[in-house]
Amino acid sequence: MFNNKTILITGGTGSFGKKFISMLLDRYRPKKIIVYSRDELKQFEMQQKFNAPCMRYFIGDVRDGARLEKAMYKVDYVVHAAALKQVPAAEYNPMECIMTNVHGAQNVINAAIACGVKKVIALSTDKAANPINLYGATKLCSDKLFTAANAMVGDRETRFAVVRYGNVVGSRGSVVPFFKNLVANGATELPITDERMTRFWLKLEDGVNFVFKNFERMQGGEIFIPKIPSMRVVDLAKAIAPELPIKVIGIRPGEKLHEVMCPSDLYYDTIEFDDHFVIMPSFDIKKYDYTTNAIGEKGKPVPDGFDYNSGNNPHFLTVEELREMNP
């Protein structure tokens, strides 16, 4: 699908962007890959690793609509991965988070439509479902913008979809590097907020594969949600440092005990497939039948009141499995 195509990824110097580009170069022969991001040092460092002739590096901010439009000239596919995602920072700097995560999303949409991009996938988070913090609220707003964008295109070909998933193993700012840093610096205990806390858990490679697949599946307007395992944070602490005691410090503002991917309030718009769910748009877009996707896979409506959260997930990782995922 990506052979001889031009792909742009916003926030391309992040954990997801690096893995996405690595796998893209391994599997396909793209015409051009454009990394669009703000930090020239990260781009310089990335160029040392990814220096294939097809690579291009654009310094720019998703807040800058004109720069985005220049970057998307003759682009076929866009992955929107740029975001401010640190929950405490978003609470303290709310307008900065809104400018990047909401206004930036609309700028990506406008540029993609103006440039005739074929397909756009925006990355989302489980924190966008029933959000209780500003970061989650901005990502929910972004999801709504990308879904509604399919009604803005008229007779043009541009299509938009969203991929929502949970915590990515070892990503920047996540709990794994936090725990490992404590251990490396001689910590005598590991802090967790609540022994009951659970999270969805995803390997970065699986997240990239899910995005690849959904470029094929998408018709426009879907929120794609993978069926992935959950983990107990207390088990993760045991996997990383089994010899250290655990200190319960209390839940932080903006945290949930369990994260939600498919809210029960949207069960009537949720379709289950073999390895994923799809939340359909709440209004008709092009009269698509979302129970059959673009590659012919068939799904079925979920039961009344269905919700998919990290606490009721039938698949939990064991301490041993977590240790293998976090060597």
Regions found by a protein language model. Name each.
Residues 80, 84-140, 144, 148:
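Conserved Rossmann-fold NAD(P)-dependent oxidoreductase catalytic core, especially the SDR/UDP-sugar
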Residues 37, 58-59, 99, 248:
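Conserved residues in the N-terminal Rossmann fold of short-chain dehydrogenase/reductase
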Residues 6-26:
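N-terminal Rossmann NAD(P)H-binding glycine-rich loop of SDR-like oxidoreductase domains
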Residues 56-77:
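Conserved Rossmann-fold cofactor-binding substructure of NAD(P)-dependent oxidoreductases
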Residues 28-42:
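Conserved glycine-rich Rossmann-like NAD(P)H-binding loop of the short-chain dehydrogenase/reductase
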Residues 4, 114, 148-327:
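Strand-loop microenvironment adjacent to phosphate/nucleotide-handling motifs in alpha/beta enzyme folds
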Residues 57, 97, 160-163:
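Hydrophobic/aromatic anchor residues within beta-strands of the central parallel beta-sheet
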Residues 10, 72-81, 122:
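Rossmann-fold scaffold of SDR-type NAD(P)-dependent oxidoreductases
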